[in-house]
Regions:
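N-terminal leader/targeting segments and the immediate start of mature chains
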Residues: 1-60, 71, 94-95, 125-128, ...
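Intrinsically disordered, low-complexity boundary segments flanking structured domains
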Residues: 20-25, 103-108, 123-125, 163
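Disulfide-rich extracellular modules and peptides
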Residues: 29, 89, 99-101, 158-160, ...
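Short, solvent-exposed coil/turn segments at beta-strand boundaries
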Residues: 29-33, 53-62, 78-86, 131-133, ...
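Intrinsically disordered, low-complexity segments enriched in polar/charged residues with Gly/Pro
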Residues: 38-41, 66-67, 74-76, 125, ...
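An acidic-aromatic
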Residues: 49-115, 165-175
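Acidic, glycine-rich loop-and-strand cores that form catalytic or ligand-binding grooves
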Residues: 106-134
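Gly/Pro-enriched, hydrophobic low-complexity segments
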Residues: 131-198
Length: 215
């Protein structure tokens, strides 16, 4: 028990040192993260809820919507290779695939390098053990989309907690739950074989990650 407490103290100290030396520069996500992502509109409409996987080194993202989330005729399964500017919309049931160009490559899984650090706060209680979470708040603009965003990440670890996107056409709220620093199956970042040979569909220059979520 004493060993566990000592490790917690050491870990907290290391986090404090890392925070002090960061000079409020944008932190970087762990190499691999996975968990549940929920997206709603500011009007309160549920837009999507499902499992995400993110590879920060290769900048690849997979999101598979929970089929039990809502009464829908189709469910989202997308794979995005941001560095390559490719978005795959996958239909595993019918083994079909749609492949689009993605010119705009910023997203909420990674803090943009030009983000502004707003503050550091505690959610919950800072004085009661395991009853609080220290987070850092970031914000910035996406002029190409005529939009702005805000993000909150854990102070130590840079795990996503929540995010918001405010644009001319839509406002979105993102929440992240049960985030782990691993991905069970690395193959989630590999497009299925039936996506090979599919012709690219050209998309507008402002086509983005945020266009995936709509009523």
């Amino acid at each position: 028990m004493h060993t566990v407490k000592l490790l917690c103290v050491v870990f907290s100290c290391l986090c404090a040192v890392a925070w002090a030396s960061s000079n409020s520069q944008p932190c970087h996500s762990p190499p691999l993260t996975s968990g549940t992502m929920k997206v709603v509109s500011t009007g309160g409409h549920d837009l999507a809820s499902g499992e995400f996987s993110y590879d920060s080194k290769a900048n690849k993202f997979r999101f598979v919507e929970d089929t039990a989330h809502a009464n829908k005729s189709s469910y989202m399964d997308v794979l995005i290779h941001f560095e390559e500017g490719v978005l795959y919309e996958i239909d595993s049931k019918n083994e079909s695939c749609k492949k689009e160009t993605l010119q705009f490559r910023k997203h909420l899984m990674e803090i943009p390098p030009d983000a502004t650090h707003e503050s550091e706060i505690y959610m919950g209680s800072p004085s009661v053990t395991e009853q609080g979470l220290r987070v850092r708040l970031w914000n910035g603009k996406l002029p190409e989309l005529h939009a702005h965003y805000s993000l909150s990440t854990t102070s130590c670890g840079c795990l996503p907690v929540s995010g918001s996107y405010y644009g001319d056409k839509k406002d979105l709220l993102f929440s992240f739950f049960g985030v782990e620093t691993e991905v069970d199956d690395p193959q989630v970042f590999v497009p299925p074989a039936y996506c090979e040979g599919v012709t690219f569909e050209e998309a507008p220059d402002d086509h983005s990650f945020f266009d995936l979520f709509h009523d």
